[in-house]
Amino acid sequence: MIVKTLLFLFLSITPKEKIDTLYHKIDPYSISKQLAFYELYPDTDIGKKALQRALDLVNIHRPLSDQIDCKVKIPPFNPNLIISLSSQLPKKGMENISEEELLTIKKMASHLHNRRLKGFYVQNLEDAKTIETDQIDLTRFLLLELVEDPKLRLFYEATVDLMALEILAHLPKGATLEEKLEKISSYVFHDMEYRFPPQSIWVEEIDSYTLLPTILDSRFGVCLGVSTLYLALAQRLDLPLVPITPPGHIFVRFEHKDAVINIETTARGIHLPDSHYLSVQTKSLKRRTLREVIGLNFMNQGALYWQQNNHKKAVEAYTIAEKYMGEDPLLMRFKGLQHLFLGEQEIAKNIFEKIRNVTLEGSTYKDTQIDDLMLNNIDADGIKLLYEKEGNQRSDIEKQIKLLENKLTKFPKFRDGIFHLAGAWLALNRTKEAFEVLLKYHVIDSQNPVVEYYLAALALDRLTLQSGKVHLKKAQELLKQQSYTPNVLKDLYLAYKKEDPTFDF
């Protein structure tokens, strides 16, 4: 009887009631979902209500003198575009969106904060050169460098604009900076589910997932890619953020009054303290400008070409990066190496002379790679070994060990090669071999606190405490000269103290 009653009630629901029920299930604060509903039911009262609701959400944050009137003709949106923006499904490239639709999005987004930046109105790279760093529009500059088709550039800009409007619609008028931060993270990491690409993809093409168009098309991104998107959205919402670059990584930081929040873009935006990124090798974190973030995108593009052994294209990418980063030591090292691999020794030498023995900002020890190259302690093929893809299988690591050992037989003073060989032995849990290899480094160069720390740690593991204490004291002495005592060094000292209560620095 109950089943028959329910069936009767279901069959008695009118089409209008079904549409009403469907409408009340969608997010009342989502512009894109309201517009998508309107696109499906444009001739119904509830469809027109959805359009009005979408416009109301936009108008909340627009000045009264510039409200969008529902009576003004709004061209219908491409449903595929709206659905892709309001779901977790990756886009499969540019949709067939019309110029009229792009102009509509542009009108809806005209109140976003990035419209106050001079950089938003730049139309070519020549004009971009004159824009001050604090006036750069990150999205516009990146797309001018990356995308030749003007309409495609407009499409990607419109995509970011719609994302910003979605976030803004969920914020009250006069929202605090903290509220904006929370909503951007919620939207990027939970609603849209931007995440690190699957291993099957990133192993082959990891550096392509730094570029904004790829991020927008795929919903996948590595640290730089998602951080770039986060910064682009923050510019539209008037949320000041600072890009921070630990070695080989980037995240964004929110600083306001006494609040300091790190947004770790590879871990759904959670806060990790600075200490998480510091080590024996890294004593401080480098702050970057938005101009440098553009350059970092092209550093990663250069790495992609390098990975493909296309050294000429890598030089081109690094040259673009140089426009935005100047003669950044790490950038210049990578660019110089490409010239070296192309057989352009004189160009490479001129670059290397500028960065020889440089200590990267935040690092506890100078770069030895270029110094050894110029001392003929290694050749170009030996340098290449350090940058080849490293497999995780045991056979891959054993192959790497054999190649490094063969190269070090000919070039026994190549410090980076020795350090990499020790790391390979450690990957196989062969601490004895790793310790013996690092001792060779110590004989050549006893001023590297990182090597001294690892020697001390390995000595403790092998319970050769006397020799380990020598290296631990050496590491402490070298770091004390830099007024730096990392937590891992303190922990290692306490571990020695546990084995020998009489031990002290």
Model-derived features: where do they sit?
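Sec-dependent signal peptide recognition
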Residues: 1-8
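A structural boundary/capping signal
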Residues: 13-505
